[in-house]
């Protein structure tokens, strides 16, 4: 419901609500990103938050500063919420122990990308009306994809049958919530939606 309300906000001439006025959100990207970082920055600004954009390439990380020290420095500067993307699994989870503010996982090594899964589920729900009993195929490099991992988990929780297809060398041994197959035609047969990974 909140996503639909925010979608209506985007259709207004002035795309802003005061929900986060007075809050500071830091997008802390320890690895490069375009779509995820900009999406979060726009969302925070549209909810009237002040936004600090952190880029690892131009930070003290280049001189050996740890993720923890970087986040503690931002906390000392008054940051209220952190959107974190890291190439190492578990950084977002660890961050919840290091800082008092809210932590949003914007991509976590090969392990997870829950916010992308939420967006994909929302898109599919808008297109299909429901995910209950729908067949969703995820195709590509499943083994190394945090998008496939998070997507399969969430879509199956929402009632979808998830089939992941890729070459045998790019399929994990198992993936909670998904049927794995090296046969593309099996995944695509009677699929209601197809997600193709890069």
PLM features: what roles do these ranges have?
Residues 48-61, 160-172:
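Short beta-strand elements in bilobed, periplasmic/extracellular small-molecule ligand-binding domains
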Residues 27, 82-84, 195-196:
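Redox-cofactor binding/interface segments in oxidoreductases and associated redox assembly factors
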Residues 30-42, 126-198:
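Glycine-rich phosphate/diphosphate-binding loop of Rossmann-like nucleotide-binding domains
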Residues 1-42:
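Positively charged, low-complexity intrinsically disordered leader regions
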Residues 69-154:
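Anion-binding alpha/beta catalytic cores of soluble intermediary-metabolism enzymes, centered on
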Residues 62-63, 112-119, 173-175, 190-192:
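Short, charged, surface-exposed secondary-structure boundary motifs
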């Amino acid at each position: 419901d909140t996503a639909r309300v925010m979608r209506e906000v985007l259709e207004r001439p002035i795309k802003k609500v005061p929900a986060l006025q007075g809050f500071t959100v830091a997008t802390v990207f320890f690895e490069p990103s375009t779509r995820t970082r900009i999406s979060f920055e726009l969302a925070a600004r549209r909810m009237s938050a002040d936004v600090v954009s952190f880029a690892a390439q131009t930070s003290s990380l280049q001189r050996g500063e740890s993720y923890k020290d970087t986040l503690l420095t931002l906390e000392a500067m008054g940051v209220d919420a952190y959107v974190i993307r890291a190439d190492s699994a578990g950084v977002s989870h660890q961050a919840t122990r290091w800082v008092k503010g809210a932590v949003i996982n914007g991509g976590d090594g090969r392990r997870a990308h829950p916010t992308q899964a939420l967006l994909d589920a929302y898109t599919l729900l808008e297109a299909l009306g429901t995910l209950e009993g729908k067949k969703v195929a995820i195709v590509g490099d499943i083994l190394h994809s945090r998008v496939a991992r998070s997507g399969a988990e969430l879509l199956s929780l929402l009632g979808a049958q998830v089939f992941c297809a890729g070459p045998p060398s790019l399929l994990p041994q198992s993936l909670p919530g998904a049927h794995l197959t090296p046969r593309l035609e099996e995944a695509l047969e009677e699929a209601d939606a197809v997600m193709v990974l890069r």
